[in-house]
Amino acid sequence: MSRYRGPRLKIVRRLGDLPGFTNKIQKRQASTQNKGKKTAKKRLSQYSIRLQEKQKLRYNYGVTERQLLLYVRKARRIKGSTGQILLQQLEMRLDNIIYRLGMAPTIANARQLVNHGHIVVNDRIVTIPSYRCKPKDIISVRNNSTSRNVITNNLSFSDSRLPPHLSFKKESLVALVNGLVDRQWIPLNINELLVVEYYSRMA
């Protein structure tokens, strides 16, 4: 299954706010709560609930079905909480790190920056969005006016809060990966254990 390229608000209305997918936030009106008193909400099956959580993860991080399955399989082979390890793997993708630094408004935009050769990791240009960043990696912007202007412009509109596992000097456009992200710093309303359960027969 390829990446979704349709209307983003349609997905947000169905799954809830997905910060990495779109910076547009779902509007919750009081009138919709009143309607809920008249119309009973359809009860979801356990499978549907797991599917919904899986879709949240896939859309938010912009990965394909096959990629997500591979991440789950890798997480299962690592000692610890499979759900948290899965989230850490997705959070350490280069496109997500660029988004978290505020260099891009969404992960999709961050992916384009990487694809177009604007991003440097440890003094080497990296054009693979799924590149897995590691603690002590130094991430910077390619030293040309086009790259620096694009990212400086994005930063001027960014209000993202920098998580403690990242350090960033905006003046020089140089960032450092301090370590792995803690679960509490992942701004996504999701039950990652249900995602692991969804893939339990496949992974």
From Swiss-Prot:
Keywords: Chloroplast, Plastid, Ribonucleoprotein, Ribosomal protein, RNA-binding, rRNA-binding. It holds the Pfam family S4. GO terms for molecular function: rRNA binding; structural constituent of ribosome. Residues 92-150 form the S4 RNA-binding domain. InterPro entries: Ribosomal_uS4, Ribosomal_uS4_bac-type, Ribosomal_uS4_CS, Ribosomal_uS4_N, S4_RNA-bd, S4_RNA-bd_sf. Part of the 30S ribosomal subunit. Contacts protein S5. The interaction surface between S4 and S5 is involved in control of translational fidelity. This is Small ribosomal subunit protein uS4c. It comes from Chlorokybus atmophyticus (Soil alga).
